[in-house]
């Protein structure tokens, strides 16, 4: 009899990468989400609001071998899953690498200056690195609270996946920072700290691989999720330019800061240790950033032909609201040339 996977909030970019992996290995897949979505043939869809526990219980029917939760944002969501433990064989819940804090208590969310940014070891290991205090102060503390609930119980095997900067077709992705510049035919790109900044990305393909392996091998644990050979900011800009066949002049500044702040810019490296994932579930990456980013770039080009990018990616629009001030960039570059 086929095993059953219930993907809660599974219509997004990672869910869509996960579905063929599960289906190809004989899993029956059911996707639960609030809206109506077109899914691949053979995949059942249940319209359900995860805030309604009774409705979620009904959606689970006779139960599921694994529930993958893409939309756990509050500790109450973890408690809700435990309420339904009789219907769930195991859990895989998407968390975030932003729960990590350094030994001095510095966090991602609270860092307003370079000096306040966490000083992490390279790489960051799940077992030894402290995390933020669980609470409701922000996204990271809420994720930490979810982890606390699920790791503090023995009713259900629960894998918490601390993902890096997720990218893939169909999502609100950081790659738009460079893709838009290419579409606007910018002749140069300005990068601070000579493009050495490193903020670990993870493709939806690699993340989906880790999720299905965690479903295959249930357990109570935390696993990092990041691409192999985490690229620098310069590597990322070059990979995206290569994917879209664009040539530009790289202006590599020795210091970080405006006007060259990007979604990956950070004063100290954030690199995730993937040893635990390999040891616990036999994880091996299926792609690299250079290979995987091409599909993301192609999707961005096509998707933004039909809709304004601000509508397509509202969260990224808020984050990048001042990122495409080309007039300021041009003035900065002219001043730089004059100074030389």
Give the residues covered by each predicted segment.
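N-terminal Rossmann NAD(P)H-binding glycine-rich loop of SDR-like oxidoreductase domains
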Residues: 5-25
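Glycine-rich Rossmann NAD(P)(H)-binding loop
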Residues: 8, 168, 191-197, 223-231, ...
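NAD(P)H-binding glycine-rich loop region in Rossmannoid oxidoreductase-like domains
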Residues: 35-93, 99-102
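Conserved Rossmann-fold NAD(P)-dependent oxidoreductase catalytic core, especially the SDR/UDP-sugar
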Residues: 80-144, 151-152
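Conserved beta-loop-beta element that borders a ligand/cofactor-binding pocket
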Residues: 144-169
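Substrate-positioning beta->alpha
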Residues: 173-178, 191-213
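A short C-terminal helix-loop "cap" of Rossmann-like NAD(P)-dependent dehydrogenase/epimerase domains
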Residues: 179-192, 245-251
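Mid/C-terminal beta-alpha module of Rossmann-like enzyme folds, strongest
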Residues: 210-269, 274, 294-295, 307-340
């Amino acid at each position: 009899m086929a095993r059953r996977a219930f993907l809660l909030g599974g219509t997004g970019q990672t869910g869509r990468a996960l579905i063929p992996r599960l289906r190809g290995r004989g899993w029956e897949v059911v996707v639960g989400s609030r809206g109506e979505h077109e899914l691949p043939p053979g995949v059942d869809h249940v319209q359900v609001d995860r805030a309604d526990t009774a409705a979620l219980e009904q959606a689970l029917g006779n139960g599921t071998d694994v529930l993958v939760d893409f939309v756990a944002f509050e500790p109450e969501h973890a408690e809700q899953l435990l309420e339904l433990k009789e219907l769930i064989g195991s859990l895989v819940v998407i968390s975030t690498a932003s729960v990590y804090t350094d030994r001095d208590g510095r966090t991602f969310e609270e860092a307003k200056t370079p000096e306040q940014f966490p000083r992490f070891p390279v790489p960051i290991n799940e077992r030894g690195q402290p995390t933020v205090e669980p609470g409701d102060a922000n996204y990271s503390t809420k994720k930490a609270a979810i982890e606390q609930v699920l790791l503090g119980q023995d009713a259900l095997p629960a894998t918490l996946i601390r993902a890096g900067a997720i990218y893939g077709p169909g999502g609100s992705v950081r790659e738009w920072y460079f893709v838009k510049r290419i579409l606007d035919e910018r002749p140069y790109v300005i990068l601070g700290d000579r493009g050495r900044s490193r903020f670990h990305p993870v493709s939806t393909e690699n993340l989906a691989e880790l999720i299905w392996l965690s479903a295959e091998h249930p357990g109570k644990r935390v696993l990092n999720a990041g691409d192999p050979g985490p690229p620098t900011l310069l590597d990322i800009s070059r990979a995206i330019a290569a994917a879209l066949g664009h040539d530009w002049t790289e202006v590599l500044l020795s210091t970080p800061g405006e006007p060259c702040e990007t979604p990956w810019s950070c004063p100290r490296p954030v690199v995730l240790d993937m040893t635990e994932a390999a040891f616990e579930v036999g994880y091996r990456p299926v792609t690299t950033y250079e290979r995987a980013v091409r599909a993301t770039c192609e999707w961005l080009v096509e998707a933004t032909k039909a809709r304004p990018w601000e509508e397509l990616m509202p969260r990224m629009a808020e984050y990048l609201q001042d990122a495409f001030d080309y007039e300021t960039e041009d003035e900065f570059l002219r001043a730089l040339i004059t100074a030389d």
